[in-house]
Swiss-Prot record:
GO MF, one annotated term: potassium ion leak channel activity
Protein name from the UniProt record: Potassium channel subfamily K member 13
Cellular component terms (Gene Ontology): monoatomic ion channel complex; plasma membrane
The organism of origin for this protein: Rattus norvegicus (Rat)
Transmembrane segments: 20-40, 125-145, 194-214, 263-283
């Protein structure tokens, strides 16, 4: 965020580090706020439940002439049995093949309900290596799912955009004719907005949750609200384990129900994972906006310094040394805006954010590679030049990630 020549920016904190530290601080505040809210909502209920339990324990001890120590010892044995999968009600075996398949599914998807855990040393050792490969493979599967989902959504939205251009007369209706330059630019540079993609993923997640909740209400006997709650906890891979589907000993049409349950959980995890990654783009935009606001005080003098250094073709290193946020964003606003207008790229943001976010993302990639990309260095295969994980998947596929790392 700071660089030389900017007295209001302490140190040499570049854009990446500033974003990281700001996001870490915001997450810490988010955790503190969440802890305060949940403590206010749940603490009283916990104290009341504990008081009721102590009263029941005392009444049972007096009624059956048992000491509290003996009774607590018996309850500890019950807790150990519960951890081993023993329940008072009739439940299906935890470690038959279908139960083990359900378990490994919760392992590789990182849901981890916790109702089934390995008890043997061999099982625990095998879980470490099995989870290492399984979790990595499943994350790759989720990223590939996200890539194909974004591709399909972009294709559909691009087709709709093309139809709108045809209705407006911007694109020729005769597809046999070669498109004019303006027509090609208006289509080639067009990318779907992250907001529309997020809306589509949100609707898909809601549809899956509603359908699954109706199924769980019928088959598990849960309330509809508890079913919706379970769908989110499972699909987001939080996996508390307070509610777990497909655990009863018998179901009507058991085979079909277990298959549909597996399908709903898998599709729910894929959609929620994709939606989380799209939301992360919006969070990144917010962090960038905060950084620009924090750095706006030193914008005028830093921009003038950048423009002077850009005119000096003999010393391009001045640009890289002045790694102030305003330098990396606003200093090249005019030239990049013209380029984006010529390409016809649509970015669904207000004018103040339209260019600056894309410039931030472009400059991040340039700074990571030691400066603007040159012809001699562009041919090198850099595994991380396009980003890591889901950010790499969505790189240049959405309007708001054009030029992203």
């Amino acid at each position: 965020m700071a660089g030389r020549g900017c007295s209001c920016s302490p140190g040499h904190l570049n854009e990446d580090n500033a974003r990281f530290l700001l996001l870490a601080g915001l997450i810490l505040l988010y955790l503190l706020g969440g802890a305060a809210v949940f403590s206010a909502l749940e603490l009283a209920q916990e104290l009341q439940a504990k008081q009721r339990w102590e009263e029941r324990l005392a009444n049972f001890s007096r009624g059956h002439n048992l000491s509290r120590e003996e009774l607590r010892g018996f309850l500890r044995h019950y807790e150990e049995a519960t951890k081993a999968g023993i329940r008072m009600d009739s439940v299906r075996p935890r470690w038959d093949f279908t139960g083990a398949f359900y378990f490994v599914g919760t392992v590789v998807t990182t849901i981890g309900f916790g109702m089934t855990t390995p008890a043997t040393t061999g099982g625990k050792v095998f879980l470490i290596f099995y989870g290492l490969i399984g979790c990595a493979s499943t994350i790759l599967f989720f990223n590939l799912f996200l890539e194909r989902l974004i591709t399909v959504i972009a294709y559909v939205m691009r087709t709709c955009h093309h139809q709108q251009l045809r209705r407006r007369g911007t694109v020729a209706r005769d597809n046999r004719k070669a498109p004019r330059k303006g027509e090609a630019d208006s289509l080639a540079g067009w990318k779907p907005s992250v907001y529309y993609v997020m809306l589509i993923l949100c609707l898909a997640s809601v549809a899956i949750s509603c359908g699954a909740s109706a199924l769980y209400t019928t088959m598990e006997g849960w309330s509809y609200f508890d079913s919706v709650y379970f769908c989110f906890v499972a699909s987001s891979t939080i996996g508390f384990g307070d509610l777990v589907s497909s655990q009863n000993a018998q179901y009507e049409n058991e085979g079909l129900y277990r298959f549909v349950n597996f399908f709903f959980i898998l599709m729910g995890v894929c959609c929620i994972y994709s939606m989380f990654n799209v939301i992360s783009i919006l969070i990144k935009q917010t962090v960038n906006w905060i950084l620009r606001k924090l750095d706006s005080g030193c914008f005028p003098q830093c921009q003038r310094g950048l423009l002077r250094s850009r005119r000096n073709v003999v010393m391009p290193g001045n640009i890289r040394n002045r790694c102030n946020i305003s330098i990396e964003t606003d200093g090249v606003m005019e030239s990049d805006t013209d380029g984006r207008r010529l390409s016809g790229e649509m970015i669904s943001m207000k004018d103040t954010n339209k260019v600056s976010l894309a410039i931030l993302q472009k400059q991040l990639s340039e700074m990571a590679n030691g400066g603007p990309h040159q012809t001699s260095t562009s041919s090198r295969d850099d595994e991380f030049s396009g980003g890591v994980g889901a950010f790499a998947v969505m790189n240049n596929r959405l309007a708001e990630t054009s030029g992203d790392r």
